[in-house]
């Protein structure tokens, strides 16, 4: 019998959650991570599944995700503990045939349930599936320190925030030319913040929750993690710049245009126009 804890997706979740905790992005039970799988990914591990999988209804049906398996982090679980006990802190779930709920096939032992931000994740998965023709498979939420700090001092406007991050590090425009979506402050763990996040995910692979954290999307765990890591690095540079009195020179609009042309990306027009 193959052990699901040795599968590429469980091992990938262990690495991503451990790395995020080591970065300081996921204190206590902060942060959550979901990865969309295929039936072929989980097929070799049926012998590991719960004999009687628990069923949990969704707060709203999501027919686009019908019959789709995911691996998810658990509610109230600490990222630092995923590596110690994957089955207690992670779960493989599968949405039912009409998208009205899901079964917990593996993990989330001791009656644990998926992250409270599952509505935001599933709604964002729906939008990224449509926006990327199914390419994006990962939604990651974390409390990236410097990105949060900037939401207190920068105007919380997509164009302004995006332009500052692009200027903070040359690679940013190449990595997220679609810019950073920004919500108003909202209560977490609700359908309302999930819907607002998903709406921004139609246009952006990164979405900031001011004074709280960031959502990132990507085709793989590495890509989603790297996207947030790149934005957070630029935010760290900007925090240092502002603490030293501000910019005396920066990457110009013309240079940003040249950068986009060199790497074949189309920068967010509103940010480029500033």
From Swiss-Prot:
What EC identifiers does the entry list?
A: 4.1.2.19
Q: Name one Pfam family in it.
A: Aldolase_II
Q: What does it catalyze?
A: L-rhamnulose 1-phosphate = (S)-lactaldehyde + dihydroxyacetone phosphate
Q: Does the keyword Cell cycle apply?
A: no
Its needed co-factors are: Zn(2+)
For this chain's record, the cofactor binding note is: Binds 1 zinc ion per subunit.
Positions contributing to Zn(2+) binding: 141, 143, 212
Q: Which residues form a coiled coil?
A: none
* GO biological processes: pentose catabolic process; rhamnose catabolic process
Subunit arrangement? Homotetramer.
Q: Which family does it belong to?
A: Belongs to the aldolase class II family. RhaD subfamily.
The family database entries (PANTHER family) matched by this protein are listed as: FUCULOSE PHOSPHATE ALDOLASE (PTHR22789), RHAMNULOSE-1-PHOSPHATE ALDOLASE (PTHR22789:SF16)
Question: HAMAP family, from UniProt?
Answer: RhaD
What is the annotated role of this protein in its UniProt record?
Catalyzes the reversible cleavage of L-rhamnulose-1-phosphate to dihydroxyacetone phosphate (DHAP) and L-lactaldehyde.
Q: What is this protein called?
A: Rhamnulose-1-phosphate aldolase
What gene name is given for the protein in this entry? rhaD
């Amino acid at each position: 019998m193959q052990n699901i804890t040795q599968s590429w997706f469980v091992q990938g979740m262990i690495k991503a959650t451990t790395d995020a905790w080591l970065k300081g992005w996921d204190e206590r039970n902060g942060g959550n991570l979901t990865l969309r799988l295929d039936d072929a990914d989980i097929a070799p591990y049926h012998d590991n599944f719960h004999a009687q999988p628990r069923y949990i209804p969704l707060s709203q049906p999501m027919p686009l995700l019908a019959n789709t398996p995911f691996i998810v982090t658990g509610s109230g679980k600490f990222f630092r503990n995923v590596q110690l006990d994957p089955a207690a802190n992670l779960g493989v779930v599968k949405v039912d045939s009409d998208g009205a709920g899901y079964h917990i096939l593996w993990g989330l032992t001791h009656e644990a349930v998926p992250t409270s931000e599952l509505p935001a994740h599933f709604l964002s998965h729906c939008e990224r599936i449509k926006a990327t023709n199914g390419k994006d498979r990962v939604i990651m939420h974390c409390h990236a320190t410097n990105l949060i700090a900037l939401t207190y001092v920068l105007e919380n406007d997509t164009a302004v925030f995006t332009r500052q991050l692009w200027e903070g590090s040359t690679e940013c425009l190449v990595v997220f030319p679609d810019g950073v979506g920004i919500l108003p402050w909202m209560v977490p763990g609700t359908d309302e913040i999930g819907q607002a996040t998903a709406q921004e995910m139609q246009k952006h692979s990164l979405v900031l929750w001011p004074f709280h954290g960031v959502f990132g999307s990507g085709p793989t765990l590495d890509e989603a993690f790297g996207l947030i890591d790149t934005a957070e690095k630029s935010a760290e540079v900007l925090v240092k710049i502002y603490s030293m009195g501000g910019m005396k020179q920066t990457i110009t609009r013309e240079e940003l245009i040249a950068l986009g042309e060199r790497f074949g990306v189309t920068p967010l027009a509103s940010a480029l126009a500033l």
